[in-house]
């Protein structure tokens, strides 16, 4: 649908608070029988601890002058959520917590998303544990989700050896990982195993050899 108008605003309110806002209005398309729609996103972020932050987000799609003969999927689709990003003061640990709830006049499109990860990365060691949950009735008409009704669990870890010789290669080492996919009843659907060997060069280029098994 053709965009009629839009506005975008973002910036720091002070040293701890940041806000972001975007709004787009589309024009009605009589040929395709689409109503005009308003798309809006608002985020409010608060700095916590030394390097971490917590954010609230609201995403809205609202049909304008919708009637029963038009082809729009619903009168509105909204998502509200919270996100917490953690970074340790020594820059070794990082993590995330994310929760989203979809709101819709259609009962089968009112679901949830919960995702999280925790990771550790030093000059030699790195590992990460990640999970994702998307319910079967979650809906995000503004944005994209790969699929519904799944749980993903992933673990990766690696180690780097540093060269002492005056050669282009800076470091090299193995990385292993395993990923599991389940439906929301926790019936296993798929799994992937991986083994990579990384080569990092002093000019910041990287070469990776890898094996994947499903």
What are these regions (language model features)?
Residues 18-20, 39-104, 166, 171-175:
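Surface-exposed extracellular loop regions of Gram-negative outer-membrane beta-barrel proteins
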Residues 33, 68, 141-143:
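Outer-membrane beta-barrel and related beta-rich outer-membrane complex signature
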Residues 34-36, 74-76, 109:
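Low-complexity, polar/charged sequence tracts that form flexible coils or short amphipathic helices
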Residues 1-65, 129, 151-153, 203:
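Active-site cores of enzymes that catalyze phosphoryl transfer or operate on phosphate-rich substrates
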Residues 2-4, 10, 90-214:
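Exposed, low-structure sequence patches enriched in small/polar residues
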């Amino acid at each position: 649908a053709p965009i009629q108008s839009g506005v975008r605003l973002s910036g720091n309110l002070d040293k701890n608070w940041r806000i972001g806002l975007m709004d787009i209005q589309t024009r009605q398309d009589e040929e395709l029988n689409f109503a005009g729609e308003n798309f809006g996103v608002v985020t409010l972020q608060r700095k916590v601890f030394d390097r971490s932050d917590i954010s609230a987000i609201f995403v809205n799609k609202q049909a304008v002058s919708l009637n029963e003969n038009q082809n729009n999927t619903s009168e509105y689709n909204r998502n509200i959520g919270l996100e917490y990003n953690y970074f340790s003061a020594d820059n070794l640990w990082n993590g995330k917590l994310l929760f989203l709830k979809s709101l819709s006049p259609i009962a089968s499109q009112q679901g949830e998303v919960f995702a999280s990860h925790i990771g550790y990365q030093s000059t030699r060691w790195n590992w990460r544990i990640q999970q994702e949950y998307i319910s079967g009735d979650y809906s995000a008409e503004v944005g994209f989700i790969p699929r519904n009704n799944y749980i993903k669990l992933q673990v990766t870890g690696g180690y780097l050896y540093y060269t002492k010789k005056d050669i282009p290669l800076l470091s090299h080492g193995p990385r292993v990982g395993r990923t599991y996919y389940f439906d929301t009843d926790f019936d296993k659907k798929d799994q992937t195993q991986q083994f990579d060997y990384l080569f990092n060069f002093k000019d910041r280029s990287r070469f990776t050899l890898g094996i994947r098994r499903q």
